[in-house]
């Protein structure tokens, strides 16, 4: 079924109580807002009593760091409204009562380390392993910490062979060691200029060496949808998921039973949406989130 173009913003806004926004490609690209209408759009939705939630698969920052980015871009967003996949990793470990005497090896950046430590977990790896190398000399044996009970893999600009081997050893040799992925995104809009290989490439390397499927805590897994719905006491049918990626954002909304709105300001083009190869169809699509401002004309 082909997606319908957003024509009646008023009807959409009135039909839900919560909007969940993806960030990269929806709110911003790199370090710039998608368009000048973003702040006005968010203000309008708040003025109509809508709850706003911001959900990103980008694990490089913590919620606190994302709060700072929103402020830098001139947006007033409370830290409690922000949910990153780095936070999701920590929330997942809390939800399964991960033992506090066990450690977490991180293949990723400081956002994951910050959120895990904030939740009280012992971490190793992450940025501190960025420059480590392995010399494959005859007889070399690589040691690893036997107390690691989970390996968390996210987007990592400093990905290297040392991290692959260390994570692989933990998963293969530590009994019951978990393999957790913050996301399996194929692309990442790192600087707003071009698309870059996403966190899925790092996850794929560990999957390839361990032959173990990860537990995915970011979109399109419903873990964060369930978490957000429970935290705020929302029925998922009262949520509209707004995103720019079909296989993460829109699928996430569909998996969670939400309304879905695709914006064409990020990864997905109109041609990709309409392609016969595409099997994921949002309820509605539009060019950018400021198209929701069309509601103003009906309320004046």
Model-derived segments and spans:
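Asp-based, Mg2+/Mn2+-dependent phosphohydrolase catalytic module
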Residues: 1-23, 28-50, 59-80, 90-300
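Conserved glycine-rich Rossmann-like NAD(P)H-binding loop of the short-chain dehydrogenase/reductase
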Residues: 53
């Amino acid at each position: 079924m082909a997606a319908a173009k957003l024509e009646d913003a008023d009807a959409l806004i009135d039909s839900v109580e919560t909007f969940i926004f993806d960030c990269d490609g929806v709110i911003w690209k790199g370090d710039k807002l998608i368009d000048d209408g973003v702040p006005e759009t968010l203000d309008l939705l708040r003025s109509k009593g809508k709850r706003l939630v911001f959900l990103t698969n980008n694990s490089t920052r913590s919620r606190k760091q994302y709060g700072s980015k929103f402020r830098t871009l001139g947006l007033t967003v409370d830290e409690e409204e922000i949910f990153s996949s780095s936070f999701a990793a920590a929330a997942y470990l809390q939800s399964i009562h991960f033992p506090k005497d066990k450690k977490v090896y991180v293949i990723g950046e400081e956002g994951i380390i910050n959120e895990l430590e904030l939740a009280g977990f012992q971490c190793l790896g992450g940025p501190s392993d960025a420059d480590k190398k392995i010399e494959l000399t005859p007889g070399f044996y690589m040691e690893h910490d036997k107390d690691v009970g989970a390996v968390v893999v996210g987007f990592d600009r400093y990905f290297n062979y040392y991290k692959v081997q260390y994570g692989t050893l933990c998963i293969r040799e530590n009994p019951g060691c978990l393999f957790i992925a913050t996301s399996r995104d194929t692309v990442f809009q790192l600087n707003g200029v071009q698309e870059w290989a996403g966190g899925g490439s790092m996850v794929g390397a560990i999957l390839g060496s361990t032959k173990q499927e990860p537990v995915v805590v970011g979109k399109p897994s419903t873990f964060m949808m369930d978490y957000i719905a429970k935290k705020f006491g929302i029925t998922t049918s009262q949520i509209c998921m707004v995103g720019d990626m079909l296989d993460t954002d829109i699928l996430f909304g569909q998996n969670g039973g939400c309304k879905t709105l695709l914006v064409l300001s990020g990864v997905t083009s109109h041609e990709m949406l309409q392609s016969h190869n595409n099997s994921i169809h949002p309820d509605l699509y539009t060019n950018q989130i400021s198209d929701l401002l069309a509601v103003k004309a009906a309320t004046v």
